[in-house]
Amino acid sequence: MKPVQLVMNSFITKPIQTIHNKPLTTVNVVLYYVKSIEEKVNLIMTEFVVYDAMMGSGKTTQVKEYILQNPNERFIYITPFLKESYGVVGINFNIVGDEAVPVFNDLTNDIDYDESNPLSRLRFKYPDRKKGKGSKENSLSHLMNIGYNITSTHQLFTHMSINSLIGADQYTLIIDEALSVYEETNLVSQKEVTRLLKIGILYLDEDGITVRFNRDKFGDNVKLDTDKTEGTSYEHLAMMCDLSQLLLIDGKTLVWEMSADMLRKFKKVIMCTYMFEGQLFSSYLKKHGIEYEIIKFGKKPSEVKHLFNVLDDKKLNSIGASETALSKSFFEKEPTKSTGRDACKRHLNTVMRKWGAKTDNRIFTCFKKDKTVISDVRYNKNWLPFNCRATNDYGKVENVAYLVNVFPSPTLVKAAKGKETDFDIEIHTLTEMLQFLYRGCLRNDLPMNIYIPSSRMRRILFKWLNSDFEYMKVLNDGD
């Protein structure tokens, strides 16, 4: 078949013979290019705004006001946890085990809403597996198709199929805290990746990291038609390659990347976070050429510095003296019963007793693998993941132990950076630490006792409190 080349509204296409491995016909060529132009228009029209403010500075209030001022718009509001999202949009819920379960109103045959919450008037819905024939993704897609306001989680949104976002161009997407847009994946073993690259079934795009699937080669090797991966163990791999969602880092590690077109589908995107420029999500947007506006407000570090009662004890801090002490690699190099873990266990107990911290007035973090050894029975219920965020359940806690030294995954940083993007590891580390500390009473402008044995983490925290980051100086100069 002779290659086809179309020129429409200045969008020049390359000669093609197939679309998604299907032979060209007049009908599917027209539909394909109409869809392509529609997507390019959406690329231009999507507005991306970041509300950048310290935790407890009123970002959620800003979002609520925006929604109330634009009641005729359609909204999708996503958070890390459903409990927080239900509270924001006015859905009553009960806690069953560890899960937030919405209350159903038998009189209205609908969700039970908190009428004292102004957003309850907009009658937000949530994805329901039962109504989606066993799939929350199907349910969310159905709700979008009808045009409801919707609340959901990061996890569901980031792993949706782009084809499920029906009518997204009519919606404003509101994201509470940055999305996790990269994950290391074991979809295919490293050995299998090497083999598939060698025989040409997989190959790398021009950027040197995006993985592509060659169906022609696949057919030659497994004796299937050239456009058939359906029903094979490679079907999902091929689909993810089609969506540009697999990256190969350092020639060995496969990384899943959320499709940037997921965001481009929407009319507008609003994200609420703090120090956005220090997050992988910021690098991700730059890498994909998505422009954004940052609106900053709220307090400066100097205004809250007096609330941070950071323990200054040479003996108790000695376990974190070196630059990499208490990091993930530091603990991985030690045996399970190690000097570092045992010291953390002893010092955690010493510090909490020193502060007179009762069970309901203390939290701590360490890496999950070390939790059992460090927490013991006494502190087991006080542990939270070091990357915990977007929960207000611990707003009265006054005593916090931060027993980690956080470095971003080098693999994910390489995935996010691309060739032109800078990434500040210290700012990333700072944002992770602040998110955890602000789960406690700091978010309510109350003083907190803080134990951070890592000398590196303390240095970064004080650098922020003194506004010594160049990034912070730029922001402060702009006030």
Q: Across the structure, where does each feature detected by a protein language model lie?
A:
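Pre-Walker A adenine-sensing motif
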Residues: 11, 15, 19, 25-45
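Walker A/P-loop
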Residues: 46-62
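Positively charged, amphipathic N-terminal segments that serve as targeting/anchoring signals
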Residues: 51-54, 96-103, 113-129, 197-384
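Conserved Walker A/P-loop ATP-binding site and its immediately adjacent core
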Residues: 71-109
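Conserved RecA-like ASCE P-loop NTPase motor core of nucleic-acid helicases/translocases
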Residues: 74-81, 270-271, 361-368, 449-453
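Inter-Walker segment of RecA-like/P-loop motor cores
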Residues: 95-159
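SF2 helicase catalytic motif II
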Residues: 167-197, 202
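Conserved RecA-like P-loop NTPase helicase motor core
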Residues: 382-460
